[in-house]
Amino acid sequence: MFNEILKKVDWHGNVLSLSTGKIARNADGAVLASMGNTSVLCTVVFDKNTKKDMDFFPLGVYYREMAYAAGKIPGGFIKKEGKFSEYEVLVSRLIDRSIRPLFDSNFRNDTQIICTVMSYDPRYSPDILAIIGSSAALAISGIPIVKPIGAARVGIVNDEFILNPVIHDNTGVNELDLVVAATFDSVTMIEAQACEIDEEKMLAAIEFGYKSLKPVINAIEEIKSSIRKDIFEVTARPHLRYNDEILKHFSSDIKSALLLQTKNERNQQLQLIQQKVIDYFSSKANSEANDGDDILNIEKALDDAKSKIFRDLVLQNKTRIGNRAVDEIRPIICEAGLFNTVHGSALFTRGDTQSLATITLGSSTDEQIVEQLNKCERQNFLLDYIFLPYSVGEISPLRAASRREIGHGWLAKKAIQLVIPSKDVFPYTIRIVSEITQSDGSSSMATVCSASLSLMEAGVPIKTHVAGIAMGLVLGEGNKFEILSDISGCEDHLGDMDFKVASTKNGITALQLDIKVQGINLSMIESTFRQAKIGINHILNVMNNTISCPKSELSTYAPMVQTLEIQKEKIRDVIGLGGKVIKELCKTFDVEIDISENGEVKVWGNVGENVKKAVQSIENIVFVPQIGDIFDGEVVKVIESGAFIKYVTGRDGFVHISEINDTHIKDINAHVKLGDKVKVKIIGIDHKNRVKLTLRTDKEHCKNKNEQYNDITTTTGGVKKKIKIAPKEAAVISNRKYFD
């Protein structure tokens, strides 16, 4: 019944399986890609009617992780998959960026690719299989693509490159997490997060991944040849008939406009030129330029003319938009500490692109809980990228983060992640918000710079600055090409590449490559790295001139934290029955208290004195009471034979009527009342740890019983006091402060 075609490939020690013809047979292309027990179903469907009014390729890519793939039922009130997670959006973009350069430039048909994780094996990541499966599904769909691609992940283990490292063997991903997509002869996409890897080593890693893809691409070609589906025919776009005439009459005007230095000046001039071009063709006899479709074709032809003139400027004169040299960085202005009540802020302006970054420091309860198929983790570093419509002088509704915003924010986060201190060094949850207040290209890399500046201004102990730069490419005939540093929005649109590089002074922390051509070679990547390093060093110098090291103190508006380590068996004492003790502490001192399973206690609050008092109370709770210790207590209950005194939070002791004072007492109520503040001394502890107290706190009263204990001095909340304690029974192991 099924005409299944199955291809298995031995790929560097793993078996890659590609199957088609069994599942989703109504799709134009459907491939089940598997490795180990991870399987991803990739489907392609395209509209057979060409959209003539489209000036872009309407491609939609959707990656979906189904909970059943990992044997789970979705959490939450509604037990089914909801909106796409950030990770699903990021993988969708990864697939899109890998395959988009493959399509025929004249193909303008609605196309949808859906990748569904059907089965999940924790050893093998489904994102690589999704890219490979999408490439294979496209190859058999009948869509005109130039050539298929493969994809691979590269890690580093023991200073050696490893292909597709096992997910839960983190040693292969900690130093480098690189994804490369490529055809037989060129690279189409790169995505990387790295621990300050130098350019030479990064290039070698890209080459290693690129050269490993041959068996994958061969397998896709074999499946394609087995299917032999007719290729959908595309026609040349009708706007091409206007190109020569536009270049003949308007080249000089377009060139002058492109050389203007500011974005607004260029856009205004280009708008005037566009109207002149439309008027020119409208005035001609038998013109169709008043027709809506034909006006759109004229605009497309004008765009082609701008692209050709831009390319000629770069390749022939080494001059670019804004009259810059190919390696020239736009003017940079950095400012730190703009707002008093936020915990940290910085403004980074590069040409007509501007990012305003703000820092918020929070407690461990502010950490983001992220659920994926293979794990549920808490993230204490968050970065949000917000692209505001006024940044490009436009009006649009303010909605939830777009896929583009999620992708740009994630790239900036990966670039900065390396320098973020560990929780042991800096226990705060850190949230960075980058708002793009002005945009003319490279806003994600401006976010990297503003985020780094704001972290130092906030006093977060990062070890060094991270800077980002977007590199462009203009391809000429033969092997001729030029690399552009710090591309503007127009250069991104008219050029062939957007290669984002983030780095410290020591090495690369993140990469992202998008291209509009069929691929680029390793020589172009090497030239990009070399030129990007010069640009990044320049940017780092400007940033260091503004602020070169973290401030010594946090903002007075930031929360304060003090950490204690207590014995595990004392955790229940701090929490209390039904959480009574910890709730009382939080309410009394207006603090948050976080207790981990290993006995680490963090106390958070906005008022330092309250934090210190809460810590002192916790130390009192876990403190092992010893005979002779003196406390300030409160009468909580009075009975005929004596009174119960709360001598520390959560701890009561009993004072017999005979221990109220040295005289005989007939009526205890005449001497102590509920709520009285009294000074008490421990004079006995029975086998059930019940504490016997006295109000007669003279030293001689317990002189002999104290001899077995040592006098030590401890510091609690910055206040020294002498206590009696048996060293082996100490419950407070250590006390760390993160504020003065």
UniProtKB/Swiss-Prot annotation:
Keyword Cytoplasm: yes
Family statement drawn from the similarity comment of this UniProt entry: Belongs to the polyribonucleotide nucleotidyltransferase family.
Function recorded in the entry: Involved in mRNA degradation. Catalyzes the phosphorolysis of single-stranded polyribonucleotides processively in the 3'- to 5'-direction.
Entry protein name: Polyribonucleotide nucleotidyltransferase
Gene3D superfamilies, A to Z: GHMP Kinase, N-terminal domain, K Homology domain, type 1, Nucleic acid-binding proteins
Source organism: Orientia tsutsugamushi (strain Boryong) (Rickettsia tsutsugamushi)
GO CC annotation, single: cytosol
Keyword flag Kinase: no
Gene that this sequence comes from: pnp
Binding residues annotated for Mg(2+), in chain numbering: 492, 498
Record localization: Cytoplasm
Superkingdom in the source lineage: Bacteria
Record-linked InterPro entries: ExoRNase_PH_dom1, ExoRNase_PH_dom2, ExoRNase_PH_dom2_sf, KH_dom, KH_dom_type_1, KH_dom_type_1_sf, NA-bd_OB-fold, PNPase
